[in-house]
Amino acid sequence: MKFIVKLYPEIMMKSKPVRMRFTKMLETNIRNVLKKVDEDAKVQRQWDRIMVMVPKHKPELAQAFGERLACIPGIAHVVQVDEYSFESVDDIYQQALPVYRDQIAGKTFCVRVKRTGDHDFNSIDVERYVGGGLNQFTDAIGVRLKNPDVTVNLEIDRDKLYMVTKRIEGLGGFPMATQEDVLSLISGGFDSGVSSYQFIKKGARTHYCFFNLGGAQHEIGVKQVAYHLWKTYGESHKVKFVSVPFEPVVAEILEKIDNGQMGVVLKRMMMRTAARIAERLGIQALVTGESLGQVSSQTLTNLNVIDRCTELLILRPLIAMDKQDIINESRRIGTEDFAKSMPEYCGVISQKPTVKAVLAKVEAEEKKFSEDLIDQIVAQAVTIDIREIAEQMDTRITETETVIAIETNEVVIDIRAPEEEEHKPLNIEGVEVKRIPFFKLATQFADLDKQKTYLLYCERGVMSKLQALYLIEQGYTNVKVYRP
């Protein structure tokens, strides 16, 4: 069993050297991701596609491989195929007949062939021969070239025949690390999660900068979002997570800055700080989730004033998107429930915020800040490899909160994503196991029986620790981590 990875069309349009570089990078990215699923994964690059071989002795890995490939940037689509050898067009038909006989019974169908190599026949010859045979010797209703019930997809590569058993749509975009790095300002809400995803999809290693206004609980929630985005869509490369203690800045704004200018000044201070951090990391652009007119600080005038605080490029991929479209996209990429449960920390709320800030007036207000405020904030910022989030959680969860045995009145909650749970169900004899995906746990935990203790389970223990810590920070004491 194999997967044939089709490159995103924009990659195919590149010049030969660029196309080769992109394809080689995509091959490396796929290998990095799939090796974490199974060390026996084999990946082979060709000119216009990449072949992924499922180990013959581990056919059960096909589903896991397919799910990972669907989330790797740079892929148009993936087809799962079975491989056969052939010597003639009749060989192709004879091997297709038992595979598709039952699938097309009582249905209309057509045959589509893609061919590579030198043969004494063309693709249309194969389509006619195989289609005619299937039409004559099966219980199919007949051939329909437009909108058939079943499409028989065959790929011929020299002396190999591939019968397509499944098609998986990819993310599109460019392979990770083919573009330069960006630093995304992430708050855990709908907008910043989607804007971060947009640049991951575009092939930019996306690092995260979080301005902490709400203490440990807020930071834990945002780390969950960042970790989910990285783990799902960008796992092939290491990225940084930077946490900036921003309460001192908010305190000075509330104490010293004119009420109407607070929102714009806050954003300018964030951009200044993020720019300093980006330069320290060798990053040339910031990414924000701002959308035109969504709030008072996001008018064109105010965005222009905000941009004047730094020479660093500020990118806003959501600038023309409607809020509902952003929410819909967050649902699709798996960050919606995180955003719904994220506490709102509006550290600076202006009663009459300006929508037409004047640069000179804003700069005059900013002179009221302590001279070394930004220096202090940048010095106190904590930068970690996003993979260290798991280790960080280990130091914050005590031994009594991590268990390997289950006692009476304890319920296990399997928080894995639905596709993971279906692939490898968790069944424990004599123990109640609830299935609540990690991205819904924060909103559903309050509805559970408070008299019981809940043990959170996931495959590697990372997300279960994050979720447990988040719930503990919210005041729940009946939650532990289950690590059998």
UniProtKB/Swiss-Prot annotation:
Q: Where does ATP bind?
A: L185, I186, K267, G289, Q298
Q: What superkingdom heads the lineage?
A: Bacteria
What EC number(s) does this enzyme carry? Answer: 2.8.1.4
Chief place where the protein resides: cytoplasm
A GO term (biological process) for this protein?
A: thiamine diphosphate biosynthetic process
Which residues pair up as cystines?
C346-C458
Catalysed reactions listed for this entry: [ThiI sulfur-carrier protein]-S-sulfanyl-L-cysteine + a uridine in tRNA + 2 reduced [2Fe-2S]-[ferredoxin] + ATP + H(+) = [ThiI sulfur-carrier protein]-L-cysteine + a 4-thiouridine in tRNA + 2 oxidized [2Fe-2S]-[ferredoxin] + AMP + diphosphate; [ThiS sulfur-carrier protein]-C-terminal Gly-Gly-AMP + S-sulfanyl-L-cysteinyl-[cysteine desulfurase] + AH2 = [ThiS sulfur-carrier protein]-C-terminal-Gly-aminoethanethioate + L-cysteinyl-[cysteine desulfurase] + A + AMP + 2 H(+)
Q: Which residues form the active site?
A: C458
Q: Which residues form the THUMP domain?
A: 63-167
- Which principal EC class is assigned to this enzyme? transferase
Could you list this entry's UniProt keywords, alphabetically sorted: ATP-binding, Cytoplasm, Disulfide bond, Nucleotide-binding, Redox-active center, RNA-binding, Thiamine biosynthesis, Transferase, tRNA-binding
Location in or out of the cell: Cytoplasm
Recorded hits in Pfam families, A to Z, give: Rhodanese, ThiI, ThiI_fer, THUMP
Gene Ontology CC terms, in alphabetical order: cytosol
Domain Rhodanese residue range list: 406-484
Q: Which residues, by range, are in coiled-coil regions?
A: none
Pathway membership of this protein? Cofactor biosynthesis; thiamine diphosphate biosynthesis
Which NCBIfam families does this UniProt record tie to the protein? ThiI_C_thiazole, tRNA uracil 4-sulfurtransferase ThiI
Reported function:
Catalyzes the ATP-dependent transfer of a sulfur to tRNA to produce 4-thiouridine in position 8 of tRNAs, which functions as a near-UV photosensor. Also catalyzes the transfer of sulfur to the sulfur carrier protein ThiS, forming ThiS-thiocarboxylate. This is a step in the synthesis of thiazole, in the thiamine biosynthesis pathway. The sulfur is donated as persulfide by IscS.
HAMAP family in UniProt: ThiI
Q: Could you say which protein family the record assigns here?
A: Belongs to the ThiI family.
In Swiss-Prot or TrEMBL terms, this protein is called tRNA sulfurtransferase
| Protein species of origin | Shewanella sp. (strain W3-18-1)
